[in-house]
Design a protein with these regions (language model features):
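Active-site rim beta-loop-alpha module in soluble metabolic enzymes
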Residues: 126-170
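Short, flexible loop segments at the rims of nucleotide/cofactor-binding pockets, characterized by
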Residues: 54-59, 153-155, 173
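Short acidic/polar active-site loop segments enriched in Thr and Asp
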Residues: 76-77, 174, 193
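Zn-dependent metallopeptidase/amidohydrolase metal-coordination segment
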Residues: 178-216
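Generic hydrophobic/aromatic pocket-lining and core-packing "Φ" positions
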Residues: 67, 165, 181-184
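Metabolite-binding pocket within alpha/beta catalytic cores that recognizes anionic/polar moieties
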Residues: 1-123
């Protein structure tokens, strides 16, 4: 089963048949709501990353509980949605990027299931190539899509400074967000295939002279919700049930 992690706005009850709403207890805390739905003959689990009322800021999201809970309900592949700031010269608002790698600038987040034993998980290919391919195909018919890129994750909840963005760009970052890590790493530890669709909502700090407020960003994200739903719908249909990735 494919799991979708994203904002509450990408869930459209009109286009799916709701089968169940599950509250999942985990060793890391309870996950109050995972919706199991069916569309086009496939069951999908939807988890609102920021909670039912979108009230949990990025640095307070219980990433371990979320990934653990999805595994418990039978998810073996995840499609994550991320609104990001564009850093790369080739990106502009409205573009879609499917990342192949990430940079981690978070701090203090619970980022592993292996606190009590020594385990070194390979993340040389952190994003599942088969889910990435499904996302690339789905997004390519809807928007301008970049099939490779590096996602840089910062701690939040504040926006980055222009100097921080220059540093991230120098290190190879193409987009910046606040939620993709440790989510991708935890999925890897649980042997769940993981792919991300990044929607460029704005230029990152210092890339454009225009300043962006949190309210404006929220409005831009809402404007992109319909596009994200279409990409996810297409991708879910194209993700192979049996994947060959390691």
């Amino acid at each position: 089963m494919i799991g979708i992690i994203g904002g509450t706005g990408i869930y459209d009850p009109k286009s799916v048949k709701e089968i169940a709403v599950k509250e999942v207890e985990t060793p890391y805390g309870d996950v109050p709501e995972i919706k199991i739905v069916e569309f086009n003959g496939k069951q999908v689990a939807f988890l609102p990353r920021h909670g039912k009322s979108h009230a949990i800021p990025p640095h307070r999201v219980n990433y371990r509980a979320n990934i653990y809970a999805l595994k418990e309900v039978g998810v073996d592949g995840i499609i994550s949605t991320n609104s990001v700031g564009g850093i790369g010269d080739f990106l502009k608002p409205g573009d879609v990027m499917i990342p192949h790698d990430f940079l981690d600038f978070t701090r203090g987040r619970e980022s592993t299931f292996y606190d009590d034993r020594v385990v070194h998980v390979d993340v040389s290919s952190p994003y599942c190539p088969e889910i990435r391919n499904a996302l690339i195909r789905a997004a390519g018919s809807i928007s301008k899509v970049f099939s490779n890129g590096v996602y840089a994750c910062t701690q939040g909840p504040r926006f980055e400074t222009p100097s921080e963005i220059r540093m991230i760009k120098t290190l190879g970052g193409d987009v910046v967000g606040m939620t993709g890590v440790p989510e991708v790493v935890l999925a890897r530890e649980k042997e769940i295939c993981y792919g991300s669709v990044c929607i460029v909502a704005n230029f990152a700090a210092g890339i454009s002279e225009e300043k962006l407020t949190a309210t404006e960003l929220t409005e831009i994200v809402k404007e992109n919700e319909a596009m994200v739903r279409k990409i996810i719908t297409g991708a879910v249909e194209n993700v192979p049930e049996h994947r060959k990735c390691e």
